[in-house]
């Protein structure tokens, strides 16, 4: 029997700037059946500049087009002073809490909180110094691949291994918000594991739960999905985030998918043996006089 797939509730910007909402989101993730909750650790001034030049305006055919990068990140970030309490609440709830650091100062802050896992976000997968620094802490590393080429993935995996860190999970991801299901290419989950000799999984931006269910059949060891208390609260990520009721159903569906996979065996189950006893048998007969 394969190991259980870890289900991660990605909070991202879905606290909408309110610490009370962030805390309740952690508690709701537990109620919905998540195994872990993930934060993002950055500040606008650590990853971009406040600048009105064209290169600093989002123009990628996304739901955020027309906004300045600085303004979006300023709206979306999780204040660093919240992190300790959020980690504490998650621990109270029996959840693993980890984060995506976007620079070395974020790694340092998370180390002070004994962050148990580091995830490198899709847009940071070419930041080899960041990957090396996080990997050097010898915690499990998760790499998202939403904009990555094969070479990008290879270099990122090699960066982890150079630091003596071989606990690597590579997530299939499509950095489109929401992502069209026809671009999910979930068959890559199995290929990622085989090609790079790592664990693999899914960071999902499609709508609904079809992709997570299919991901399990492709050997996913981790499934991450954006999670929100209620889409009506708004925020940068609300349109492609899953509410508690739907997330809970997704968790049940994923567990059922795992259960249905079972194991490779030709032994008959008890039910099969019972049915076999009712099967037709060869009969010979002779004419009676």
Label each region the model flagged.
Residues 1-289:
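Catalytic cores and adjacent flexible loops of soluble metabolic enzymes
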């Amino acid at each position: 029997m394969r190991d259980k797939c870890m289900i991660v509730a990605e909070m991202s910007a879905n606290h909408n700037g309110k610490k009370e909402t962030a805390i309740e989101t952690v508690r709701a993730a537990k109620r919905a059946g998540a195994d872990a909750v993930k934060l993002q650790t950055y500040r606008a001034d650590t990853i971009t500049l406040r600048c009105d030049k064209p290169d600093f305006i989002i123009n990628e055919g996304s739901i955020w087009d027309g906004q300045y990068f600085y303004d979006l990140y300023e709206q979306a970030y999780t204040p660093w002073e919240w992190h300790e309490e959020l980690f504490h609440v998650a621990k109270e709830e029996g959840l693993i809490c980890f984060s995506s650091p976007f620079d070395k100062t974020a790694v340092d802050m998370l180390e002070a909180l004994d962050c148990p896992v580091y995830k490198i976000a899709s847009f940071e997968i070419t930041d080899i110094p960041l990957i090396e620094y996080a990997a050097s802490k010898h915690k499990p590393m998760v790499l998202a691949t939403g904009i990555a080429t094969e070479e990008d993935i290879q270099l990122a995996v090699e960066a982890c291994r150079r630091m003596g860190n071989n606990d690597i999970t590579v997530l299939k991801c499509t950095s489109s918000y929401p992502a069209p299901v026809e671009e999910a290419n979930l068959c890559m989950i199995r290929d990622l594991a085989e090609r790079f000799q790592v664990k693999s999984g899914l960071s999902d931006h499609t709508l609904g739960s079809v992709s997570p269910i299919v991901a399990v059949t492709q050997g996913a060891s981790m499934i991450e999905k954006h999670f929100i208390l209620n889409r009506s609260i708004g925020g940068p990520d609300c349109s492609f985030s899953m509410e508690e009721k739907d997330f809970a159903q997704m968790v049940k569906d994923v567990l059922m998918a795992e259960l249905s996979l079972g194991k490779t065996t030709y032994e008959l189950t008890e039910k099969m043996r019972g049915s076999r006893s009712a099967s037709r048998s060869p009969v010979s007969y002779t004419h009676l006089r």
